[in-house]
Every structure is written in structure tokens, then in C-alpha cells.
A protein has these predicted regions:
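C-terminal structural segment of proteins
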Residues: 1-263
């Protein structure tokens, strides 16, 4: 059972940041995972009054507030036009619409869960994150850092992507993914993000120049084989490492060929 001693609706980001520095204080997101935990929370910090539930479009990027629900990513015309529907595909298997109306971008990103579809896609898109204390950094850098206590304010998704694809393999439609794969092309360069390994998503690049001559069936297969050798896989209840390695090769090849179609 989750027990909360004190509830505070933060009046400012400064107040929320100060409160979250204490070890037994917790920031509330959608509370979908938090409520399932057996723990005692000293102070629950609610950010819902700070205007972080908006998606803002600027000349160079889309800015996603930390309290934006995942459902908004699924239905936002601008985000999905820029990514050829990848945002909608990245969340469509996450339980159901009611769940996605509650789950937040901030919870998905700050939690850095291995099974996170959203994190996989945002890494491929070279997103940046902005914190109250630590300031702005790349999402890739944040994922490599050890845990720290801070308030995530927003996620910045830069424009200019020439094509984006998101794919996942699941044992059943609304289950956690066995493997996730996102590919984005920008200025001729490719970013591959592989998640649910079952560890958190990581970014990979075409280090050998296998796609320098463009995407063909042969180059896509070569890139898929290269990545399947480079991405470390593990075992859990949903799949073994060997199976994930085979699935990785399939998803990368399919993703590249699909990326060429939407060019």
C-alpha cells in the first residue's frame, strides 16, 4: 500500500525543487506506477498547477511539458506530421486510452524505464531535457547519468528530422515490449535507438558508413546485422537475449526500408 503523510501542490518550480531534495519526498506524475508500490512517502509534490501540461511549437522545436499526457502525443497533429506518425505508434500499445490520458511525458522520461516506448523514440529524435536544477542537457546524456533529485520541466524535440520510424515487438498487444526500435534521419545521418533490451534504450550510429550510399535491401540488412552484434541484450520473463538479438535485426531492417519509403 502507498502511504502519503503530506500532500503539497507546488506554487512554483523553485518550491517543488526545494521540496524534492529530501529523500522521502516524491514528485507526482500520473501516479500509475507510484500507486502500485508498497512504500511510505513523506511529502507528495504535485506539479499540476505549474502549467507544465502544454505542447508548445517554436520555430525550431516542439516543447513538451513534463505533465503532458501520453495521449496528447498520440493525437498532436504537428508532432505526428513531423515524425510520419511515429509518436502515435510509440504509445498506441500502452495499455489503453484511459491509461494514456493519465501517464505523463515527465514520468516516462525521468523514470528512464527499460520498457519505455516514449524514451526510445525521443532518444532517436535527439531530444533535450530541461531541469530546474541541472539545467538543459541532451536526453542521451541524461540517460547515461546516475540518478539525481531534480524537477523535469520540459522535453525539447528539435525539428528538421527527414524521416522517423518507430517499431516494437510485443508478445501481446498491450503488454510491455520485448524490444523497441526507433530510427531517425537528419541531414543524411541516422540515429538508432534500441530499448527494452530489457535495459533502458541506447543510441547507436552508423559507425562503419554502411548506409553512406543510401538505403537498399543489402545496406539495410548489413546495418541490421551490425547493430544486432553491437546492442547488448539480456533475459527476462518476456524473452531471452538470443531472441532479442534476432528481433533487433528484423526491426532495424524493416525500419530502414520503411524509412526509405517515407522519404
Amino acid at each position: 500500500m502507498l502511504t502519503i503523510d503530506q500532500y503539497v501542490r507546488a506554487e512554483s518550480l523553485e518550491q517543488a525543487y526545494e521540496l524534492c531534495q529530501k529523500r522521502n519526498h516524491v514528485v507526482l506524475g500520473g501516479m500509475l506506477w507510484l500507486k502500485m508500490q508498497d512504500r511510505k512517502v513523506g511529502t507528495a509534490i504535485d506539479l499540476c498547477g505549474l502549467g507544465l501540461d502544454r505542447i508548445t511549437e517554436t520555430e525550431r522545436a516542439f516543447e513538451l511539458g513534463a505533465m503532458v499526457p501520453l495521449r496528447a502525443l498520440e493525437t498532436h497533429e504537428g508532432l505526428n506530421a513531423m515524425t510520419q506518425g511515429a509518436f502515435a505508434r510509440s504509445v498506441e500499445h500502452i495499455v489503453g486510452v484511459q491509461f494514456r490520458n493519465c501517464a505523463t511525458v515527465g514520468g516516462s522520461v525521468f523514470g528512464r524505464f527499460g520498457f519505455s516506448d516514449v524514451l526510445t523514440l525521443l532518444l532517436a529524435l535527439d531530444a533535450r531535457v530541461v531541469f530546474q536544477g541541472a539545467g538543459e542537457m541532451s536526453l542521451e546524456e541524461f540517460c547515461a547519468r546516475p540518478p539525481f533529485r531534480d524537477i523535469l520541466i520540459r522535453v525539447i524535440v528539435p525539428k528538421g528530422t527527414e524521416g522517423t520510424v518507430y517499431l516494437s515487438q510485443r508478445n501481446s498487444a498491450t503488454d510491455f515490449p520485448v524490444l523497441t526500435c526507433a530510427i531517425a534521419r537528419r541531414e543524411g545521418a541516422f540515429r538508432f535507438s534500441i530499448g527494452a533490451r530489457p535495459g533502458r534504450a541506447r543510441v547507436y550510429r552508423d559507425e562503419k558508413g554502411l548506409l553512406a550510399g543510401g538505403i537498399t535491401r543489402d545496406s539495410a540488412q548489413a546495418m541490421a546485422e551490425d547493430l544486432s552484434r553491437r546492442v547488448p541484450m539480456g533475459d527476462n520473463l518476456r524473452a531471452g537475449a538470443e531472441y532479442r538479438t534476432k528481433i533487433c535485426q528484423v526491426l532495424v531492417r524493416r525500419g530502414l526500408l520503411k524509412l526509405e519509403e517515407v522519404r
